């Protein structure tokens, strides 16, 4: 088990109007959330592996569709992966300097809360190749759609 990593089950309440889901409570997290980001990804996209030297924590949730979360403990080499989203409503809390990312298993809306605000003048953004031998077998695709940044990490 990766130290500090948490699975947080999400409850979805539905009625004739639609549904409601609570995504996070600050009181239940080790650090306060300072920024939230919403990303739309097409099926086959991998956004990974990213890490933050200064220890930013991330809380991942897939709010529409399905995504595979992958986490790598850079010190021990231990890995974690889980498919989250509509079929498995779970948030994943990723502490500190662990490398992390996700694969869009379907077109998806992916929400992540972070414990540091992004600073374009001093970004704490670092990468490990998505196909690093420690995690390559955790992805469902061998030919992902990648950003230029994620391609450069390879």
Identify the residue ranges that each predicted region occupies.
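Non-catalytic, conserved peripheral segments adjacent to functional cores
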Residues: 1-90, 109-154
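Conserved SET/PR-domain catalytic core that frames the SAM/AdoMet-binding pocket
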Residues: 87-106
């Amino acid at each position: 088990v990766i130290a500090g990593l948490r699975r947080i089950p999400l409850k979805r309440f539905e009625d004739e109007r639609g549904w409601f889901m609570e995504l996070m409570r600050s009181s239940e997290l080790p650090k306060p959330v300072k920024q939230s980001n919403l990303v739309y990804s097409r099926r086959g996209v991998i956004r990974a592996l990213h890490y933050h030297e200064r220890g930013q924590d991330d809380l991942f949730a897939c709010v529409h569709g399905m995504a595979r979360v992958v986490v790598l403990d850079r010190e021990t080499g231990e890995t974690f992966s889980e498919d989250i989203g509509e079929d498995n409503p779970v948030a994943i809390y990723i502490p500190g300097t662990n490398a992390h990312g996700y694969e869009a298993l379907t077109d998806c809306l992916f929400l992540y809360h972070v414990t540091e605000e992004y600073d374009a003048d001093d970004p704490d953004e670092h990468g490990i190749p998505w196909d690093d031998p420690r995690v390559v077998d955790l992805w469902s695709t061998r030919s992902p759609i990648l950003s230029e940044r994620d391609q450069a990490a390879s």
